[in-house]
Amino acid sequence: MSFQVRVKQNMQDLDNRLAAFPQLNSLEKNFGVSKLYVFLTAAGIYALFLFLNWGGFLLTNLLAFAMPAFFSINAIETTNKADDTQWLTYYLVTSFLNVIEYWSQLILYYVPVYWLLKAIFLIWLALPKFNGATIIYRHLIRPYITPHVIRICKSVSRQNAAPAPTASSFAHTTATDIPPSI
């Protein structure tokens, strides 16, 4: 299948998916502009703003919240565990990105289109078609973090299994641990 045919097929598929939004259908009916063109224009303006870094931080955080919030609410309402795992993993990865963004000024110095790249990455993470969050979890987070989580959980369970010290035993051990004055 040629590239041109695939693009037309994907655009038709997107147009069919956009038909589920009554606001876009109403806009198309009232103004005679295809909902697909309205969507693509809005996406293009959004990408331009990110490329020029006009409100990049806010725009990517809105993207990181809005679409996943919708899918997360749907996941909460279903009994399917797979979609819950997808969104928990997504939030784990985006939280890690937020930690990295502490150094955002330094990142923007070396990667001026960081916000645009982050938006593309967030879309890849969030869309079930790509399953990006699960890929990141399986290949980056799980192999390096899970052994530490298991060790921490064992330590916490040992602490919870041990009897809690009373105030008098704490005072006694503290008093005996104090070295004599010189």
From Swiss-Prot:
It is found in: Endoplasmic reticulum membrane; Nucleus membrane. The chain crosses the membrane at residues 35-54, 57-75, 86-102, 106-124. It is a multi-pass membrane protein. Residues 1-34, 76-85, 125-182 are cytoplasmic. One of its GO terms (molecular function) is membrane bending activity. Residues 55-56, 103-105 are lumenal. The keyword Endoplasmic reticulum applies. GO terms for cellular component: cell division site; cortical endoplasmic reticulum; endoplasmic reticulum tubular network membrane; nuclear envelope; nuclear membrane. Keywords: Cell cycle, Cell division, Endoplasmic reticulum, Membrane, Nucleus, Transmembrane, Transmembrane helix. Required to generate and maintain the structure of the tubular endoplasmic reticulum network and the vacuole. Induces high curvature in membranes and causes membrane tubule formation. Involved in membrane/vesicle trafficking. Required for the correct positioning of the cellular division plane by delimiting the actomyosin ring assembly at the cell equator. Oligomer. Interacts with RTN1 and TTS1. This is Protein yop1. It comes from Schizosaccharomyces pombe (strain 972 / ATCC 24843) (Fission yeast).
